[in-house]
Regions:
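Beta-sheet repeat architectures centered on beta-propellers
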Residues: 1-91, 109-118, 122, 126-129, ...
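Beta-propeller and closely related beta-pinwheel folds
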Residues: 42-60, 95, 117-130, 161-319
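Conserved beta-strand positions in repeat-built beta-propeller and related beta-rich domains
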Residues: 72-75, 146-149, 188-191, 240-242, ...
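Structural signal for beta-propeller blades
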Residues: 79-80, 152-154, 195, 246, ...
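Long, contiguous N-terminal structural blocks used for assembly/anchoring
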Residues: 91-100
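Beta-hairpin (beta-strand-turn-beta-strand) motif
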Residues: 93, 108, 112, 147-150, ...
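Surface-exposed intrinsically disordered loops and tails
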Residues: 100-108
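Hydrophobic or amphipathic alpha-helical targeting/insertion segments
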Residues: 140-164
Length: 491
């Protein structure tokens, strides 16, 4: 008899064929690895019970000067302030222009010349995408500032629930996004409707925008063929991403105040929320891959990119949102699969251990813990959820499945009659095995087995896949399992 350890490295591999994932985890949902041991992602619970009006696209948390905690959420049609006790207040500005819940694509069905091209062959990229409406939110001191990319005006809310957010006087209109610099200038991106223009206010005064010898207001026109999508504070600078490239804006003092530098090509971002900033680096999902910025732009190798980008709704790609989960050194991206108009899947990267994981979850915005004790995600249903709370996953199946585990070189048939589990609490997880003789041969399943120590099983094959399924609401742990296997012949 041979004791075969099933010791697979953390993370999933979903590029190429299933055989390419030999010796790796291949699929799963709501699992992570901590110090090499597999466990479930934390559960969630509702923070609010009333759905917000409109599609939520942005969320911000902060403390005011009295240490009171605040939360703001922007939807395509509303702006909300939510107190630390979860009281929801509509602070939508008077005269605000609601936008679009979904992205729209020009050049679709009914456009172009009839019978042009061949059936089943993708047409040239001649259409234009109008993104769904989202907000960029930041703080000006203890006050909230924000801008909807559809309405284009810059608003400020001064914490009084009885008052709506109000237009910032003298600020440009028709803007794409805003942010506040480390030097306390309010930035307008895509300012005045110019997709390449960046304007900023005087330092410490967000109502002075006209440059003069007595202030530090100004503007920069980026040298790019793209349009500005988003800006984020990173490493003491401002990283500005367009739909095709990347630029860095740095403070240089008088007379220019700020200057821009082109730092990367073919690394654009599809939507303003697809980027996360963690400590001293930024990471974002592009249209066909991932990139990081830590002073230099670098592509990020992704072991599940085939799976993600082969089944994604490219027309709604601007809805992708990235969320830090610093407690576990993770960045999560929520994205719409090809058959969905809204985000229904996630891809997660652990930047400390450099592994990837995938699963299903419907979230449209989120924020890391810090101001509040837990990460807060916003569902596509308009409900806010506290995450990493217990292990209740609202009925979602928690599982992980391996790629082929070949015994030896895979040329001999093995007969397996016993499983020796490695669980923290036996019975929390069931095991199902799938065996086949050749990579494309018919697959046979065995189980599920409720694991005891040891567990009697009976199956054979040249390659074996294993699926572990967790019982609901269990905080399980799985280490290195072993199979008791007897080698047979080559047939």
């Amino acid at each position: 008899m041979t004791l075969l350890p099933i010791k697979l490295p953390p993370g999933m591999y979903k590029n190429g064929t299933e055989l390419d994932a030999a010796g790796r985890w291949f699929d799963g949902n709501l699992v992570r690895w901590v110090e090499g041991m597999m466990r479930p992602v934390g559960g969630w619970q509702q923070r609010t019970t009333t759905a917000l009006t409109g599609k939520p696209r942005a969320i911000l948390t902060w403390r005011d000067n009295s240490a009171t905690r605040h939360l703001a959420v922007g939807t395509h049609s509303k702006l909300y302030a939510i107190s630390q006790s979860s009281v929801i207040t509509d602070i939508t500005p008077t005269g605000f222009t609601p936008g679009n819940p979904d992205a729209t694509v020009g050049g679709g069905y009914g456009t172009g010349t009839y019978s042009y091209g061949f059936y089943g062959v993708p047409r040239p990229d001649v259409g234009s995408v109008t993104p769904e409406t989202t907000w960029s939110l930041d703080t000006w001191g203890e006050y909230l500032v924000g801008c909807s990319n559809y309405d284009g005006k810059i608003y400020e809310w001064q914490l009084n629930p009885a008052n709506k957010a109000a237009v910032v006087a003298n600020a440009p209109t028709g803007n794409t996004a805003i942010l506040v610099s480390n030097e306390r200038a309010l930035f307008a991106l895509g300012a005045g409707g110019d997709p390449r223009l960046i304007s900023w206010s005087d330092l410490e005064n967000n109502t002075v925008w006209t440059p003069s010898s007595s202030n530090l207001a100004g503007s920069i026109e980026l040298q790019t063929g793209g349009r500005i999508i988003v800006g984020k504070r990173v490493r003491g600078q401002i990283l500005v991403l367009t739909d095709i490239d990347a630029h860095v804006v740095s403070y240089v003092g008088q007379p220019f105040v700020y200057q821009s530098e082109y730092v990367g090509r073919a690394c654009g971002i599809p939507g303003p929320n697809a980027i996360a900033v963690q400590d001293n680096f930024a990471v974002w999902m592009s249209t066909r891959g991932f990139f990081t910025y830590d002073g230099y732009i670098k592509p990020l190798a992704c072991e599940v990119s085939d799976y993600v980008f082969s089944d994604i709704n490219t027309a709604q790609l601007s809805k992708v949102c990235a969320v830090n989960n610093s407690q576990f050194n993770e960045v999560w991206w929520f994205y719409p699969s090809a058959s969905s108009q809204e985000n229904d899947r996630y891809v997660m990267w652990n930047y400390a251990d450099n592994y990837w994981s995938v699963g299903t979850m419907a979230r449209s915005a989120g924020t890391d813990r810090g101001v509040f004790s837990n990460p807060i995600f916003v569902g596509t249903d308009g409900i806010l959820y506290d995450h990493e709370v217990g292990v209740n996953h609202a009925g979602s199946t928690v599982y992980v499945e391996s790629g082929p585990v070949q015994i030896g070189n895979g040329d001999n048939v093995y007969y397996v009659n016993e499983l020796i589990p490695d669980e923290r609490n036996q019975g929390d997880v069931t095991a199902t095995f799938f065996s086949r003789y050749y990579p494309n041969a018919a697959e046979r399943s065995y189980g599920p087995y409720s694991m005891t120590n040891p567990t009697s099983v009976r199956f054979n094959g040249r390659q074996i896949n294993m699926r572990l399924t967790a019982s609901p609401n269990t905080d399980w742990r799985v280490g290195t399992m072993r199979l008791n296997a007897q080698p047979g012949g080559r047939r």
